[in-house]
Amino acid sequence: MIETLLPASALAFPAIDPVIFRIGPLAVHWYGLGYVVGILFAWWYGKKLLRSHRLWANNQPPMAPEALDDFVIWAALGVVLGGRIGYVLFYNFSYYISNPLAIPALWDGGMSFHGGILGTTLAMILFARSRGILVWSMFDTIAAGVPIGLGVVRVANFINSELWGRVSDVPWAVYFPNGGPLPRHPSQLYEAFLEGLVLFFVLFVLVWGARKLKQPGFVAGAFVTGYGLSRIAVEFFREPDAQIGYLFGGWLTMGMVLSVPMVLLGLWAMWRANRAAARNA
């Protein structure tokens, strides 16, 4: 019955070329641009926060704004290497263990946000320790601007017609070119809204309104918790990766499994930051 109703209520997929422009053999994709925009925005916004001395404990930023100029390369390597290795380990290990030469083929797709955040976290720890910067404040500085990049990348996922949602009869369901004959939830846009706009707004209020940068680790904890909760919510509408499917009961996905520890870790980081602030009060 639902199959007969779906076609009349769904939306056609917008004809947007995944390639923005070409220069000879070089093709610039929306997906790649999303990562560039995300890194550059986090860099710019982080420097803005560091220049606003009143946001930090004792009006003393944890580092000079110029330090982020050096961190950009570290961040890019952490995102790309962590994202790729995470995808290989979490989502398609059996394929890549049999085809190791395919691991560096980033142009064929396959990145994991959970791997990307692990790679970036490692880069932040190494960078902060090499410069004598408080690690928790380093986390806060970067985390505050990350949601914008997440939102842009999710929109790029939509343009690429990838990571689409489950079959649905909602009026805004979309016929994806490679998503089969039935319309699906545009779950990429749900993620762009929750992980991008909503999460950035929450962190913006915590930073500029509640002045939570004065409590090292709180903003980073809020980001990790917010992302984890957003991802878990959207996983109920997102089609699981074909090579994995559901892990349990027709509802549990790998995205959920990887996000639950993030929520717990983020809650712990916020609790720790509040407790430290209370002790120093």
Swiss-Prot record:
Positions contributing to a 1,2-diacyl-sn-glycero-3-phospho-(1'-sn-glycerol) binding: R154
Keywords in alphabetical order: Cell inner membrane, Cell membrane, Membrane, Transferase, Transmembrane, Transmembrane helix
Cross-referenced Pfam families: LGT
Transmembrane segments: 23-43, 71-91, 107-127, 133-153, 189-209, 217-237, 247-267
Localization, UniProt: Cell inner membrane
Listed GO MF terms: phosphatidylglycerol-prolipoprotein diacylglyceryl transferase activity
Highest rank taxon of the organism: Bacteria
EC identifiers of the protein: 2.5.1.145
GO cellular component: plasma membrane
UniProt pathway: Protein modification; lipoprotein biosynthesis (diacylglyceryl transfer)
Membrane topology: Multi-pass membrane protein
Principal location: membrane
Similarity comment text for this entry: Belongs to the Lgt family.
Role of this protein: Catalyzes the transfer of the diacylglyceryl group from phosphatidylglycerol to the sulfhydryl group of the N-terminal cysteine of a prolipoprotein, the first step in the formation of mature lipoproteins.
HAMAP family in the cross-refs: Lgt
Designated name of the protein: Phosphatidylglycerol--prolipoprotein diacylglyceryl transferase
Organism (species): Brucella canis (strain ATCC 23365 / NCTC 10854 / RM-666)
